[in-house]
UniProtKB/Swiss-Prot annotation:
Component of the small ribosomal subunit. Mature ribosomes consist of a small (40S) and a large (60S) subunit. The 40S subunit contains about 33 different proteins and 1 molecule of RNA (18S). The 60S subunit contains about 49 different proteins and 3 molecules of RNA (28S, 5.8S and 5S). Interacts with oho23B/rpS21. One of its GO terms (molecular function) is ribosome binding. The keyword Ribosomal protein applies. Required for the assembly and/or stability of the 40S ribosomal subunit. Required for the processing of the 20S rRNA-precursor to mature 18S rRNA in a late step of the maturation of 40S ribosomal subunits. Required during oogenesis and imaginal development. Signal peptide: none annotated. It holds the Pfam family Ribosomal_S2. InterPro entries: Ribosomal_uS2, Ribosomal_uS2_C, Ribosomal_uS2_CS, Ribosomal_uS2_euk, Ribosomal_uS2_euk/arc, Ribosomal_uS2_flav_dom_sf. This is Small ribosomal subunit protein uS2. Keywords: Cytoplasm, Developmental protein, Nucleus, Ribonucleoprotein, Ribosomal protein. NCBIfam families: uS2_euk_arch (TIGR01012). Residues 251-270 are annotated as: Disordered. It comes from Drosophila ananassae (Fruit fly). One of its GO terms (biological process) is ribosomal small subunit assembly.
Length: 270
């Protein structure tokens, strides 16, 4: 799929990320249509996925997404909790439409209901849990891209990206790689420059574990310092109210004592 171009080939750094996230580890069962993507089978029965074919299908899926003129017509879906955060982040950076959580039955086929949508392309996290949108897409001829494990059914799926879709880190990494490839094909970011968005943002975090981590971080913090009260010398101030009151009392004359008796008569008598 890379056409022999080194710039499109799978880099060592990406291979390391996939191995750390256990993207290459499939399930113990194999669907007959997924046998072509299995590299070998381990002694414990776990099937190893060929990461070279995973990368080729990832590039093919990115080209299909870029071919859609209006990015909002591409719907990215995840019913499983481990893929919901990755779907929301993917939609944020690629301007696609996310459906995280329960899918409303009839959203693609029932034109009466308010939630009716007409997408041009679907990208689902798991064909087993997202079977309802895949089935409805087959009724209205909507192409489907899916992250598939070794035991995933490929019915009604047009582009299958083989990977470990049962691991939170693996599925988060695959959505991150797909988002990066889409942005590169659009010309938003360069292939020679590292994408500044870290893959950790696409990983699912259990709310209970997140609360425990926050509580543990608070316990490691040093106790807050209590500042001791400092006694500052109080300056002696005079009470201006007393001074004003004293001046007022001393300066007021008694008008009753100096009352001048006058008479209306000429002799001065009343």
């Amino acid at each position: 799929m890379s056409g022999g171009l080194d710039i499109l080939s799978l880099k060592e750094d990406d291979i390391t990320k996939m191995l750390v996230a256990t993207t290459h580890l499939g399930s113990e069962n194999v669907n007959f249509q997924m046998e072509q993507y299995v590299y070998k089978r381990r002694a414990d029965g776990v099937n190893i996925i060929n990461l070279g074919k995973t990368w080729e299908k990832l590039q093919l899926a990115a080209r299909a997404i870029v071919a859609i003129d209006n990015a909002s017509d591409v719907f990215v879906i995840s019913s499983r909790p481990i893929g919901q955060r990755a779907v929301l982040k993917f939609a944020k950076y690629t301007d696609t439409t996310p459906i995280a959580g329960r899918f409303t039955p009839g959203a693609f086929t029932n034109q009466i209901q308010p939630a009716f949508r007409e997408p041009r392309l679907l990208v689902v996290t798991d064909p087993n849990t997202d079977h309802q949108p895949i089935m409805e897409a087959s009724y209205v001829n909507i192409p489907v891209i899916a992250f598939t494990n070794t035991d995933s059914p490929l019915r009604y799926i047009d582009i299958a990206i083989p990977c470990n879709n049962k691991s939170a880190h693996s599925i988060g990494l695959m959505w991150w790689l797909l988002a990066r490839e889409v942005l590169r094909l659009r010309g938003t970011i360069s292939r020679s420059v590292e994408w500044p968005v870290v893959v950790d943002l696409f990983f699912y975090r259990d709310p209970e574990e997140a609360e425990k981590e926050e509580a543990a971080a608070k316990e490691l913090l040093p106790p807050p310092k209590i500042e001791e009260a400092v006694d500052h010398p109080v300056e002696e101030t005079t009470n201006w109210a007393d001074e004003v009151a004293a001046e007022t009392v001393g300066g007021v004359e008694d008008w009753n004592e100096d009352t001048v008796k006058t008479s209306w008569g000429s002799d001065g008598q009343f």
